[in-house]
Structure formats: C-alpha cells, structure tokens
Amino acid sequence: MLVHTYSAMERPDGLGAAAGGARLSSLPQAAYGPAPPLCHTPAATAAAEFQPPYFPPPYPQPPLPYGQAPDAAAAFPHLAGDPYGGLAPLAQPQPPQAAWAAPRAAARAHEEPPGLLAPPARALGLDPRRDYATAVPRLLHGLADGAHGLADAPLGLPGLAAAPGLEDLQAMDEPGMSLLDQSVIKKVPIPSKASSLSALSLAKDSLVGGITNPGEVFCSVPGRLSLLSSTSKYKVTVGEVQRRLSPPECLNASLLGGVLRRAKSKNGGRCLRERLEKIGLNLPAGRRKAANVTLLTSLVEGEAVHLARDFGYVCETEFPAKAAAEYLCRQHADPGELHSRKSMLLAAKQICKEFADLMAQDRSPLGNSRPALILEPGVQSCLTHFSLITHGFGGPAICAALTAFQNYLLESLKGLDKMFLSSVGSGHGETKASEKDAKHRK
C-alpha cells in the first residue's frame, strides 16, 4: 500500500512545518476537515468513484492577515462554520442501480413510440419497465378508427376508461357517395339509434358525412369586380366551400385562401385547415389542384351569378343586332340570292332555338338548390361540370349570348323581307313602264 504523507514538507519561504503550525494554531480546526487517505486499495477505489470532486469556495479567499488579529474566529466569521456543509449529501455513495435508473428510463422513453399510456403511466407513478402497450391499441389515426378497440380493451387503470357511449359510435357510410380518394368530407362517427341524435335527425339537418349545415355562412368576402364606391360583400356558405374543394376544381389551401380573400401569413394554411375541420371538411396538406386556374377561379358563386345576370341584361338591351343584320343584308343584296339566304337564316334560327331550349332545361345546382332533373343524367352531368368550373356563370352567359344571336337572326329575316318586297315592287314598275312605251309606239 502506497501512502503519501506531507508532514515533512517545507514551505518555499524557508519556514518549517512547526513554524507554519504555530502561525495557524489560532484558527478553528472545524474549518478544514481531515483529508482522505490517498491509497489504492480496492475498497477505497470503489468508494472514491462516487465521491464528489473538490469544489473551491464560490467567493474569493482574501489573504489571511497572520499575526494581526488576536482571535481568528472574530476576524473571519465566515470561517466559523463548515464551508462544505452543503456538499455533505453528495458525499454519500449511491448504488449503481439508482445511478443508472434515470438514464435507462430516458433511453427507453426515447426508443419507444408515443403511445396511449405513456403520459398516464408516468402520472400514476407506474413502473416504466412494464409494457402496457401490448394490450392497448394506440390511436394514431383519429378516434373513428380506434374507437371500438379502445372500448373493448381491458385497460385496468383508473382514469383511462372508455368514454360513456363511445362503444355506441359507428361510422356512417353513404351508399351513394363515391368520393373515396378526393373526398373533402371528414368522416366522423355518428351516434347509433340508441343515442339521442339519430341518423334520421342528422339527415334532416343536412349533416351528411359529418359536415355541418351547407347553408350556414362560412365567411363574407368582398367582390373583385365591383367599384370602390359600390363595394359589395358576398356570403360564402359551407356548401360552396365544399364544392370548391371537391372535383372538378379540388382547390388547395393556397388557392382557397385566395378565393376567400385571406391574407397570407406564416400559419395561414394550417389555420384554414383547422377551421375547415371544425365544420367537417378535410383539406390535406400538399394537395394539388385538379383544374387549370382561370379568372373565374377567383370569383365566388354569388359574384359569378351576379356577373352572369348583368351580362344577360347588357346582351339583351345593348347588343346592336339590327345594325349588324342590316350591314350583312346589304352585302348580300343580289335578287337571285334572296330566297337561298332566307332559307339559310330560317335553318340557323331553328338550330339556335333547339340549342337554346336545351340550355333552358339545364338543372345544374345553383348555390345550395337541387332542382329536379329534366335532361338525361349523361348530358346533365356534363352541364353540371361546366357550371361548377364557372361557378354558375357559364350556363346563363351562354343563354344570354344565344338570345343576342337570335335577335340578330330575326333582324336579318326582317331585312330580307324588305329587300324582297322592294325588288318585287321595282320589277312590277318596270313592266308597267315598258307597256306604256309600247302603246305610244303604236
């Protein structure tokens, strides 16, 4: 055993150990505890592994004025007590199991996936080494997918029992809905017949697939085409938002925010998705639009219908159908072509009338209305697609254009009738003049 002693060491200033001891004899002995023996025995080595290191006092040590104070305890009151009394609990050796328990628990918590029982187990003081996750399903994809497993699994823990009535929840599946991959309606569980709200009452309230009332106002947006002096706001309903997120447009969060006139912000898309989830609509992040963006994409349905109505009024009252018909009739004033041209105009009028009658039978949904169908489903579905792309502007606009074209055809037929009468009258006058000349010659 190798033991180091310091009894014979001398100071560099020439004073011996005896002189130094005489100088420091007045200091209290409790200020400096006995130094541990420096040895290399196995027992001492095992105990030294858990001994705290030496920490100097947190204050600067002033030089001791040797020989100037008769009483060192009175001159230095801060040395009266034990300066290392606060480190006494650290000097107690800890067993290896307690020292490594916290790192092992932290590593286990880092390796295990976040489950249902991790926070409750820690809150109840349960042993972290026990694995409760094998008997309990983890809810990773929402309540609708794991509600039955949560109600059936024997948790056996207080405070973690299934919610009352949770086992009665069942997912509603509409047989007529074919919105599997592109669905924007959030599937939520609805109570069964035994619950207070039945499926019949939900159907009456138009809560189809978890969506709230389609006629409920989602927000109000200012018009894009109105003047500043007559700015009007249009109400956007929940049903319109659902139509904009559904085919054929399938708008993403960025385009929908532009349609709703929402200012761009850092978390604008996330806030919009959270608000849509509250009304039962699902807008996944990173979604791509399905249709090309046009100027009509920025219009809400109310403004698009307003634009179509104004366009129809202008076409009916301001389109120069008579001037255009007279101009074209003068270019085809040959008497030999009058009959053939009139036949072509009558045929065009008939074709235009047939097409106008077809457009008049269009029953595309306008807003939240669902009129009864008149046309065949194949033709009506195509017209509905066109109406959804134009937000209700396309059909009325085409009808207004057809009305203007029909007015042109009517004015053209009137012009041809006048030209035919004038040509017949002029021909009859020429025959009378020739007869008079023949009589004078006789």
From Swiss-Prot:
Motif PPxY motif: where in chain: 54-59
GO biological process, one term: regulation of cell population proliferation
Database matches in InterPro entries: TF_AP2, TF_AP2_C
Assembly information from the UniProt record: Binds DNA as a dimer. Can form homodimers or heterodimers with other AP-2 family members.
Family to which this protein belongs: Belongs to the AP-2 family.
Tissue and organ expression note: Expressed in skin, primary keratinocytes, immortalized keratinocytes, and HeLa cell line.
Cell compartments where the protein resides: Nucleus
Sites of Phosphoserine modification: 246
Gene label: TFAP2E
Protein name: Transcription factor AP-2-epsilon
Region (H-S-H (helix-span-helix), dimerization): 287-417
